[in-house]
């Protein structure tokens, strides 16, 4: 609802300083600031003001400011402190109830594309107000302030609140969606096992924070690599949230596979359906051409080149990220953000009849014979309620079973590497090979 009418009876915010930009820091046990809160006003600064006014249906008034307890939790950034209270509005049909979306790695390139898609309404719809809770690090906090400033300047009507912090317990408070993008990239000389441990510790901490303060039905999408095992670590540290609610992002791999099949068949990519990425987000991933369809027909009836499908197609999908890095000089960011949007929309929009989508999900109870207690990409369908079910009507041949066994073995080995982070004892790391995607190097 746009602000269309001003009412002079609403009181003005109390002003405490003349500075244009200020920071409020809070600490727990560390000396460095853990939470930044800055306020912009057209002429003066409002340090501790919370804005609210009573809004009747079909009536909008200018907000009245109320002094906020300085000891209370700062819950807004900049101009978002000056927005009117949505509580009364939520009772009307103009807005849905505000949802809290937490994003880690919020100062990174992927988030730089994603946040503006979220704020614009592209993801959750044009009538869904959102609050963005952005998690950064001590090193990235200034960049995160810049991101918040850009969000301010974009004037998104659906973006009602922005919080920036380096404390996951603050960012994940009441989160209904958690998009976990931040992870340490693999540097020169870093062994794959070491990276599993380094990033695993990050996701163990974030899992504990989600467990403590997030919504009990929060949906969690893990993007930071190695995302399958990071998702497993996260869910093991968040027993209060259903394991089924955790996803490892394999949608970019699915999109890449659809693109390659469309190119080979000479059709537009919307003709490709029923595409599954099985297994790990690594070069052992299995793009499934056996069950995929092109214009409603089995792929093998359209592309009658089994050698190309088994060799060139599969390798192109597995190594697409590395080729992009060679051409572009950096890893995927824009296309990754698009795939995150696709992954979310697949959960909140009913899956088209007969189709499905790929997501890395917890394997317990799966109908395919995949080992339990790992996060494995499989075909899913959704009714659009944020939940999903696994697809039963898929077929397997010897080639597909052989490939599935390889990626399954890799994930089981990764699981043993992080046993100390999942509460399953001492880690024993014996990885079958270095199959990490080039973008993670």
From Swiss-Prot:
NAD(+) binds at residue 206. The active site is at 281 (proton acceptor). NADP(+) binds at residues 105-111, 199, 223-225. PROSITE patterns: MDH (PS00068). Disulfide bonds join 76-81, 417-429. One of its GO terms (cellular component) is chloroplast. Its main location: plastid. Chloroplast NADP-MDH is activated upon illumination. In order to be enzymatically active, disulfide bridges on the protein must be reduced by thioredoxin which receives electrons from ferredoxin and the electron transport system of photosynthesis. One of its GO terms (biological process) is malate metabolic process. Residues 1-58 form a transit peptide. Keywords: Chloroplast, Disulfide bond, NADP, Oxidoreductase, Plastid, Transit peptide. Its EC number is 1.1.1.82. Belongs to the LDH/MDH superfamily. MDH type 2 family. The chloroplastic, NADP-dependent form is essential for the photosynthesis C4 cycle, which allows plants to circumvent the problem of photorespiration. In C4 plants, NADP-MDH activity acts to convert oxaloacetate to malate in chloroplasts of mesophyll cells for transport to the bundle sheath cells. This is Malate dehydrogenase [NADP], chloroplastic. It comes from Pisum sativum. The lineage of its organism: Eukaryota, Viridiplantae, Streptophyta, Embryophyta, Tracheophyta.
């Amino acid at each position: 609802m746009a602000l269309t009418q001003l009412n002079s009876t609403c009181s003005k915010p109390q002003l405490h300083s003349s500075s244009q930009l200020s920071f409020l820091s809070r600490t727990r046990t560390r000396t460095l600031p853990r939470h930044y809160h800055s306020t912009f006003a057209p002429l003066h600064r409002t340090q501790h003001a919370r804005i609210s006014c009573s809004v009747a249906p079909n009536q909008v008034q200018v907000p009245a400011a109320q002094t906020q307890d300085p000891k209370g939790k700062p819950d807004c950034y900049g101009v978002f402190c000056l927005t009117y209270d949505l509580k009364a509005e939520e009772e009307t049909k103009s807005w849905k109830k505000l949802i809290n979306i937490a994003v880690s790695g919020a100062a990174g390139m992927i988030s730089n594309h994603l946040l503006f898609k979220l704020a614009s309404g592209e993801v959750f719809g044009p009538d869904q107000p959102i609050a963005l809770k952005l998690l950064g690090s001590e090193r990235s906090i200034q960049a995160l302030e810049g991101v918040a400033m850009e969000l301010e300047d974009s004037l998104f009507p659906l973006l009602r609140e922005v919080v920036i912090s380096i404390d996951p317990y603050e960012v994940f408070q009441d989160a209904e969606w958690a998009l976990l993008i931040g992870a340490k990239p693999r540097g020169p000389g870093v062994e794959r096992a070491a990276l599993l441990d380094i990033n695993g510790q990050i996701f163990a901490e974030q899992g504990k924070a989600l467990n403590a303060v997030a919504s009990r039905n929060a949906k969690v999408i893990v993007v930071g690599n190695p995302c399958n095992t990071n998702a497993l670590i996260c869910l093991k540290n968040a027993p209060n949230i259903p394991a089924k609610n955790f996803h490892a992002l394999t949608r970019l791999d699915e999109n890449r596979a659809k693109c390659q099949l469309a190119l080979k068949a000479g059709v537009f990519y919307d003709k490709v359906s029923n595409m599954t990425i099985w297994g790990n987000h690594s070069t052992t991933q299995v793009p499934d051409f056996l069950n995929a369809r092109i214009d409603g027909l089995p792929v093998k009836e359209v592309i009658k080149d089994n050698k190309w499908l088994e060799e060139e197609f599969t390798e192109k999908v597995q190594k697409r990220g590395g080729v992009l890095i060679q051409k572009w000089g950096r890893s995927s960011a824009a296309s990754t953000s698009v795939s995150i949007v696709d992954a979310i929309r697949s959960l909140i929009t009913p899956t088209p009849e007969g189709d499905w989508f790929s997501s890395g999900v917890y394997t317990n109870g799966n109908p395919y014979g995949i080992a339990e207690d790992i996060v494995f990409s499989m075909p899913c369908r959704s009714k659009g309620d944020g939940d999903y079910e696994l697809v039963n009507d898929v077929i397997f041949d010897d080639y597909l079973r052989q490939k599935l066994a390889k990626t399954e073995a890799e994930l089981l080995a990764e699981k043993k590497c992080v046993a100390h982070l999942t509460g399953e004892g001492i880690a024993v790391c014996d990885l079958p090979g270095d199959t990490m995607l080039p973008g993670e190097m």
